[in-house]
From Swiss-Prot:
This is Insulin-induced gene 2 protein. The gene is INSIG2. The record marks 115 as: Required for the recognition of 25-hydroxycholesterol. It comes from Homo sapiens. Residues 52-70, 127-129, 176-189 are lumenal. It is a multi-pass membrane protein.
Length: 225
């Protein structure tokens, strides 16, 4: 009778949506898809904010922008977001430094809000010159890292992402793949690296939070075994 009772365990708790899948490869795919759509959504939202400065990659018409020549920009941002979001927890595991600072969704959402606020400031606040704009946004971006990350790997990846993304963007502009509508290209270059840095930190935090559920499932399974 005791054996019969042990063979019929109670209902298992599945937890969050990503925890209900036990395959690591499927978990990786789910996290990548989620990060991709988050990146696409943020790209569209931040582009709408930049319309105020007339430096957007899209035409002012929001509906027509989806079908414009720059339709590929949001998917590219989504792909980059997926890569960044998956890379951050992977680097943490390889370095043996699991990120434990402010690991909850409320902190992640505040990080997203601050990132959007930094982008909004670059579009709405008037600065005397481009140097003042660059220094202000750099301070805000580093403040975002210090408030929501504080990891050496996060800072290093953020700097690398900002440098690489800025170089790729400049190459695309110089080769005529697309161009900004603003005549003041120096203004665009003054805030671009800071936005990329803050975006890398933000997507890294989202990726870490999503990966945390997979770690919980693995720990629960090993404990049950």
């Amino acid at each position: 009778m005791a054996e019969g009772e042990t063979e019929s365990p109670g209902p298992k708790k599945c937890g969050p949506y990503i925890s209900s899948v036990t395959s690591q490869s499927v978990n990786l795919m789910i996290r990548g898809v989620v990060l991709f759509f988050i990146g696409v959504f943020l790209a569209l939202v931040l582009n709408l904010l930049q319309i105020q400065r007339n430096v957007t990659l899209f035409p002012p018409d929001v509906i027509a922008s989806i079908f414009s020549s720059a339709w590929w920009v949001p998917p590219c941002c989504g792909t980059a977001s997926a890569v960044i979001g998956l890379l951050y927890p992977c680097i943490d595991r390889h370095l043996g430094e699991p990120h434990k600072f402010k690991r909850e969704w409320s902190s992640v959402m505040r990080c997203v809000a601050v990132f959007v606020g930094i982008n909004h400031a670059s579009a709405k606040v008037d600065f005397d010159n481009n140097i003042q704009l660059s220094l202000t946004l750099a301070a805000l971006s580093i403040g975002l890292w210090w408030t929501f990350d504080r990891s050496r790997s996060g800072f290093g990846l953020g700097v690398g992402i900002a440098f690489l993304a800025t170089v790729v963007t400049q190459l695309l502009v110089y080769n005529g793949v697309y161009q900004y509508t603003s005549p003041d290209f120096l203004y665009v270059r003054s805030w671009l690296p800071c936005i990329f840095f803050a975006g890398g930190i933000t997507m890294g935090n989202i990726g870490r939070q999503l990966a945390m559920y997979e770690c919980k499932v693995i720990a629960e399974k090993s404990h049950q075994e």
